[in-house]
Amino acid sequence: MFISLLLTFGFTNAQSDQDLLVEDMLLIADNFGTPAAEAAAIQSSAGWFSSARDLGEWKVEISVHGNAVFIPGSKQTKLASNKDFNILNIQGSTNALLPTVFGGDTDVVFEGELIGQEFSFDAIDGLNKEVVIHPFPQVTVGLPYGTEVALRFVPRVTINDVGVSTSGIGLKHNFAQYFKYSRPDDFQVAAVVTYSNINIDYEYTPIEISASGSKVLELNRIDVKADIWLLQGLVSKLYGDFEVFGAMGVTSSNFDYSMGGGGSLLPTLNDELGALGGNDVKFKADLGFNYYIGNFKISSAFTAGSFFNANLGLHYKI
């Protein structure tokens, strides 16, 4: 009976330690990956439409864009303290600045004890990025009733151990057509709604935690999947070959995190990460300029939100 109680206590204690370890790894993953999800929301909502004017029924515009999102210092590091963790500690210190996915290398080491056995692992290194460039093509088609549909798609590409794929669809409807005596060079007003899907994965130096001779957790990759909606009001004014436009909008983003690797705790960790993402709502403002040369248009737009993003586009109207 006594031996049975000891075995039960030992099993319960091991389960408790593993649950606490999962909570600690959730915090590390959240701090590391959240800035990437936020930056993805800003980039995916940029460059959809650069004019409130009607493109024209069944007219087609082919464009190539480049986004550059600027990463502030506050999004490159995250302060961590021993009091934030359950069984993990920062080796040799009570707190440390840890890199996010955009931060640089770090010499911070975590240590802890699981089922009576000590373990340690290096904190995850970041990409050391202050600017993230994202090019993409887009096709826009004019529909009846002053409406346009835009499509963009980028297959998965890997740059510096980061894989990215994006796709999306956007709709714009011109409301100036309902104004009496409205002309194309008058003040234009439109509403925009878009949907984007983004997949990001980042491979890093593996983290391994073992106890009682078995691998408890191995992590070597973080995956971020995002579904992002944009609702935006767009205004523009044409002055000859030059056009000014501005927009105010809101993004609603659903993020899904998961970790790649192995070990007995990985399924539990990913289940908890799946519940961690949730919905994030952000406001954003755009200001931009267009220059028309025949059937070509050069657009530039600047977005202010949780990040600052610049978009440059070259458009050709058929």
Model region roles, listed by residue range:
Residues 14-110, 184:
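Outer-membrane beta-barrel biogenesis signature
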Residues 44, 51, 62-64, 137-143, ...:
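Residues on the lipid-exposed face of transmembrane beta-strands in outer-membrane beta-barrel proteins
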Residues 50-58, 73, 161, 176-189, ...:
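Short loop/turn motifs that connect adjacent beta-strands in outer-membrane beta-barrel proteins
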Residues 56-58, 130-135, 163-169, 185, ...:
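Residues that define the transmembrane beta-barrel architecture of outer-membrane proteins
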Residues 75-77, 109, 113-129, 158-164, ...:
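Extracellular/periplasm-exposed beta-strand and loop segments of Gram-negative cell-envelope proteins
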Residues 83-85, 92-96, 102, 245-318:
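Outer membrane beta-barrel transmembrane domains
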